[in-house]
Design a protein with these regions (language model features):
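Short loop/turn segments immediately following the C-termini of beta-strands
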Residues: 68-70, 117-121, 127, 170-172, ...
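A short beta-strand motif characteristic of beta-propeller blades
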Residues: 43-48, 90-97, 138-144, 205-210, ...
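Asp-box/WD-like beta-propeller blade repeats and closely related beta-sheet repeat scaffolds
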Residues: 92, 101-102, 120-159, 171-173
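Fungal secretory targeting signals
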Residues: 1-24
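Blade-level signature of beta-propeller repeat domains, shared across WD40, Kelch, NHL, RCC1
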Residues: 251, 402-428
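Beta-rich, blade/repeat-based domains predominating
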Residues: 49-61, 97-113, 117, 145-164, ...
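Conserved beta-propeller blade signature
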Residues: 63-67, 113-116, 164-168, 228-232, ...
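Beta-propeller domain segments
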Residues: 25-32, 36, 171-174, 184-205, ...
């Protein structure tokens, strides 16, 4: 009688045989919505029929790992490189069959431990890049269960500090008032020493507060040139001020700077960025009663309460480094390998008219590691790839989510609404 292991191997082999053939994946695929591209860019659809793809991670051998939020887990994709956008899927298989995985993924510096997140836990798996296999999962961080829509737990291991895992957790409801205290454990980024997570899981609230007052910072990235950590904020829905609805154009989405994790004298480590009390202005004309209000100024929503006033918002919390159009929903930020630009996926709106977002954009950075645009700018965002008609969104257009650079400087991007994976070449 065959052993359990041999039967398992047979089942795995049969499953692999059912995957699409190489030739089929190298065929010309037609996108649901052909991206419009800025001059100098090229793009190609290389994989479709993904199940709500979210985050991307290249392993040490150039294999691409895709988190699929649609109850699938993590997919392992081997690529054939023919230069430029001529990239084909050589093979693919299910790496982790865990339907509870929601978004986050990261690899240890040596490439041998894979981290992934559910809504409640961060899991660690022994990982073999060559074989495309994982070992038994173990929970290393727990205690993140909450109600509401914000169930992603973004993960980042800074290259400047490879023993640290940053975990971003959003609010529960739209306006989560208890997060006015960092001890709530929500609407913040916490840091964990991986060297101390070899035993049982630790609660999320035991991590070091790296930044708080961050409503739902799904995208967290590192500038490779100076180690600066940046996040992109999905801000408040249905904003009003003293009973007046201002939500269509306010508040703006945010690009926030957290400094470098390795910096012993980083003054931004543990800083408060304002939520749930303060929100960045995008359209100044609808914000009344605030002298000299500018794009990026932080103001209250609702009515003043105690010490929480517009003046408080403009003097106490850290203001965003840049502000973007309201409700465009930035979900990832990845820096070009030269550190001179950051690419941001804007998933797109549900809470404004006309619809906006649904695009990939970039922000230019200078040699000092900061955006070249002023914090009051409305033109810092440079569109890279977009839909030709946002009126058909969100139902019939691409909605970018996860981004990843390969070793040749190409940018890979997934669209969750259409289940697609694109590769882009960028200008020198």
């Amino acid at each position: 009688m065959a052993s359990i292991k041999s039967l398992a191997a047979l089942v795995a082999a049969m499953g692999a045989a059912l995957l699409p053939a190489v030739a089929a994946q190298c065929a010309n695929l037609t996108p649901v919505s052909q991206p419009q591209l800025a001059p100098g860019y090229s793009a190609k659809l290389i994989l479709n029929q993904l199940s709500d793809p979210r985050s991307l991670q290249f392993d040490s051998l150039g294999n691409l790992l895709i988190v699929e939020q649609g109850g699938t887990g993590i997919r392992y994709v081997k690529l054939t490189d023919k230069g430029g956008v001529n990239v084909c899927v050589a093979s693919q298989k299910q790496l982790i069959p865990n339907g509870n995985l929601t978004h986050g993924i990261a690899l240890s510096a040596n490439g041998k431990t894979l981290y992934a997140s559910t809504a409640t836990d961060v899991l660690a798996y022994p990982y073999d890049a060559a074989a495309g296999t994982v070992g038994q999962a173990r929970s290393i961080i727990n205690g993140m269960a909450q109600t509401g829509y914000h169930q992603t737990r973004t993960l980042l291991i800074p290259k400047d500090k490879p023993n640290v895992l940053l975990v971003s957790r959003g609010s529960a409801p739209n306006l989560d008032l208890p997060t006015a205290e960092a001890s709530s454990g929500r609407s913040q980024i916490r840091a964990f020493d991986l060297n101390k997570l070899a035993g049982g899981p630790v609660p999320y609230t035991s991590g070091e507060v790296f930044g708080w007052g961050l409503r739902n910072s799904v995208g967290v990235g590192e500038n490779p040139k100076d180690g600066g950590i940046w996040s992109v904020e999905n801000s408040l829905d249905d904003m009003e001020r003293s009973g007046v609805d201002v939500h269509n154009e306010n508040p703006g989405e945010e690009l926030n700077y957290h400094g470098s994790y390795k910096g012993a004298r980083n003054p931004l480590k543990g800083a408060n960025y304002g939520y749930p009390n303060c929100f960045a202005v995008w359209e100044t004309s609808t914000i009344t009663g605030v002298p000299n209000v500018q794009v990026g100024s932080q103001v209250i929503q609702g009515s003043p309460s105690g010490n929480v006033t517009d003046q408080y918002c403009q003097t106490v919390p850290v203001a965003p480094r840049l502000t973007f159009t309201a409700h465009t929903a930035p979900l990832d930020i990845k820096f070009h390998p030269n550190g001179r630009s950051a690419y941001i996926s804007f998933h797109g709106s549900w809470n404004r008219q006309p619809p906006d977002g649904y695009r990939l954009s970039k922000v230019q950075f200078g040699a000092n590691g900061q955006p070249t645009a002023a914090s009051t700018s409305k033109s810092a965002e440079i569109k890279v790839a977009w839909n030709s008609d946002n009126a058909v969104c969100p139902g019939s257009c691409f909605r970018p989510v996860g981004l990843a650079w390969d070793k040749k400087g190409r940018l890979f991007m997934v669209s969750d609404s259409t289940g697609e994976l694109f590769v882009l070449t960028v200008p020198a």
